[in-house]
């Protein structure tokens, strides 16, 4: 029998699909990545092509194995981690999506949310799903598809349509339509799942007109869901045995499996999660109560704050403003000036997330004077990411009653030393960057490996979280407080736009 030497993590993100191959020591052996098309039909709308998502993800799996000559019979299991909330509805008979995937960033369902609020469902949603009533989550996206795609509602009521977040879609495709499943972490992001009873909420399905037959089966984040023979040379069937939404996978990859441990992922958005164990903490400060993974992949509760625009605001500097040619250049230009020269950039391009939850706020640059140059704007954009993180962390500490001694960080933007140092200064907290920053993939791999006995216990994994660098705060309290007050004023300017939305075309 061939020794199964590897675990593969499929990391399906907002802008790219990746496959990461790891060995038993959790070393990364091979990586493949492919970007895919971002579709913007109109202002505030964001879509992906589900078939392109699957095509890019499956090709990266083949490429990652092929780079190192790894056969499929050498792979013990596959774990999946994915962009959350992004919504796909497809016909189970044809296997084809009825519409593009509606991405988590998309704000088209703001009016549906207003209608649900007017019908008195806001507090019910908060109490039973742990979420706030916002276009961010999947439920209103499903309703929009059923209401706006010709024939969709009729087919749904006839039992022909299936709903899934991206993990569900990938597993369904990889098992040739045999398995329609999700895990607790992804289900908890739909605004359709009752986190008290751990089941789909029949009242919310009824209120949004979504047939229960569309919903996937919900399972733990670490168990065998099905098998696939996609990729690889030998055609051996490989177990798919780990699923977690990207942020919960990162939390697990950072080994934040006990109550009170927290991390921030700096990706397209920024996501701060704190594991609260078996205690459901209801936020008083605009945070989400959601589901994460306990030590064995069982559901545990967590607090989460989401910042919609993190790394995406650096992309904006590159792609729209043309101030930099590469995202890595932002650190160089930000350090060419000592301060932002009084400038604040609030990147509310698709509204504001936690703790504000203002769907109508818009991006704002304040404090401009004749002496402001491009370096100041670049620096202020990076500082805006750190300020938004403080907004969330302050709320999280108030809700949980826990003062963090350190924040664990991951994601692409943590390579930016200026951002990490400024983050530490703004928080007055140590920031720890791990040696292996691919913690989202690590989390998916750990969950998959534990399910098939590739790793025997959580204790075996605990020692793998080595720190690359710790950033210590250097800013004095007076300066920290003064600058943060300026940020709060800038946020109010961004929110003022919501009062003027009747002036938009």
Swiss-Prot record:
InterPro entries: ATPase_NBD (IPR043129), Carb_kinase_FGGY (IPR000577), Carb_kinase_FGGY_CS (IPR018483), FGGY_C (IPR018485), FGGY_N (IPR018484), Glycerol_kin (IPR005999). GO terms for molecular function: ATP binding; glycerol kinase activity. Inhibited by fructose 1,6-bisphosphate (FBP). Transmembrane segments: none annotated. ADP binds at residues 14, 18, 268, 311, 412, 416. It is an enzyme of class 2 (transferase). Pathway: Polyol metabolism; glycerol degradation via glycerol kinase pathway; sn-glycerol 3-phosphate from glycerol: step 1/1. One of its GO terms (cellular component) is cytosol. Keywords: ATP-binding, Glycerol metabolism, Kinase, Nucleotide-binding, Transferase. ATP binds at residues 14-16, 268, 311, 315, 412. PROSITE patterns: FGGY_KINASES_1 (PS00933), FGGY_KINASES_2 (PS00445). Its EC number is 2.7.1.30. Sn-glycerol 3-phosphate binds at residues 14, 84-85, 136, 246. It catalyses: glycerol + ATP = sn-glycerol 3-phosphate + ADP + H(+). It comes from the Bacteria. Pfam families: FGGY_C, FGGY_N. Glycerol binds at residues 84-85, 136, 246-247. GO terms for biological process: glycerol catabolic process; glycerol metabolic process; glycerol-3-phosphate metabolic process. Belongs to the FGGY kinase family. Key enzyme in the regulation of glycerol uptake and metabolism. Catalyzes the phosphorylation of glycerol to yield sn-glycerol 3-phosphate. This is Glycerol kinase. The lineage of its organism: Bacteria, Pseudomonadati, Pseudomonadota, Gammaproteobacteria, Vibrionales. The gene is glpK.
């Amino acid at each position: 029998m061939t020794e199964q030497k590897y675990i593969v993590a499929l990391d399906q993100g907002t802008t790219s699909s990746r496959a990461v191959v790891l060995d038993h020591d959790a070393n990364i052996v091979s990586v493949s990545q492919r970007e895919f098309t971002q579709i913007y039909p109109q202002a505030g709308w964001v879509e992906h092509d589900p078939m392109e998502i699957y095509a890019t993800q499956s090709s990266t799996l083949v490429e990652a194995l092929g780079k190192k000559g790894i056969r499929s019979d050498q792979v013990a299991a596959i774990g999946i981690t994915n962009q959350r909330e992004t919504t796909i509805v497809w016909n189970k008979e044809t296997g084809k999506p009825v519409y593009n995937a509606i991405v988590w960033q998309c704000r088209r369902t703001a009016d549906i949310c207003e209608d649900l609020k007017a019908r008195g469902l806001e507090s019910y949603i908060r109490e039973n799903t742990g979420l706030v009533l916002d276009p961010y989550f999947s439920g209103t996206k499903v309703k929009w598809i059923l209401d706006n795609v010709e024939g969709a509602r009729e087919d749904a009521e006839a039992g022909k349509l299936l709903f899934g977040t991206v993990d569900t879609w990938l597993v369904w495709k990889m098992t040739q339509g045999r398995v329609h499943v999700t895990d607790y972490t992804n289900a908890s992001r739909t605004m359709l799942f009752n986190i008290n009873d751990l089941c789909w909420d029949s009242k919310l399905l009824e209120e949004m007109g979504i047939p229960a037959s569309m919903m996937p089966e919900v399972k733990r984040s670490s168990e065998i869901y099905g098998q696939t023979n996609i990729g690889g040379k030998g055609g051996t069937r490989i177990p798919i045995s780990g699923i977690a939404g990207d942020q919960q996978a990162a939390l697990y990859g950072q080994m934040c499996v006990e109550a009170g441990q927290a991390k921030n992922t700096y990706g397209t958005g920024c996501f701060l999660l704190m594991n609260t164990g078996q205690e459901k903490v209801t936020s008083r400060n605009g945070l989400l109560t959601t589901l994460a993974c306990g030590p064995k992949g069982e559901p545990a509760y967590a607090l989460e704050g989401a910042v919609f625009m993190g790394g995406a605001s650096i992309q904006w500097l590159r792609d729209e403003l043309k101030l930099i040619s590469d995202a890595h250049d932002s650190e160089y230009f930000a350090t060419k000036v000592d301060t932002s020269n009084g400038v604040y950039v609030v990147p509310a391009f698709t509204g504001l997330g936690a703790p504000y939850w203002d769907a109508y706020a818009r991006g704002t640059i304040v404090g401009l004077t004749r002496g402001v140059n491009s370096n100041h704007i670049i620096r202020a954009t990076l500082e805006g990411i750190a300020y938004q993180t403080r907004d969330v962390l302050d709320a999280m500490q108030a809700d949980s009653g826990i003062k963090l001694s350190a924040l664990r960080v991951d994601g692409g933007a943590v390579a930016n030393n200026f951002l990490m140092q400024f983050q530490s200064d703004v928080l007055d907290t140590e920031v720890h960057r791990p040696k292996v920053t691919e913690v989202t993939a690590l989390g998916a791999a750990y969950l998959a490996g534990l399910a098939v006995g590739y790793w025997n216990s959580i204790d075996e994994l605990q020692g793998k979280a080595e720190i690359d660098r710790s950033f210590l705060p250097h800013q004095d309290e007076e300066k920290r407080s003064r600058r943060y007050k300026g940020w709060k004023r800038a946020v109010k300017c961004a929110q003022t736009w919501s009062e003027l939305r009747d002036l938009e075309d």
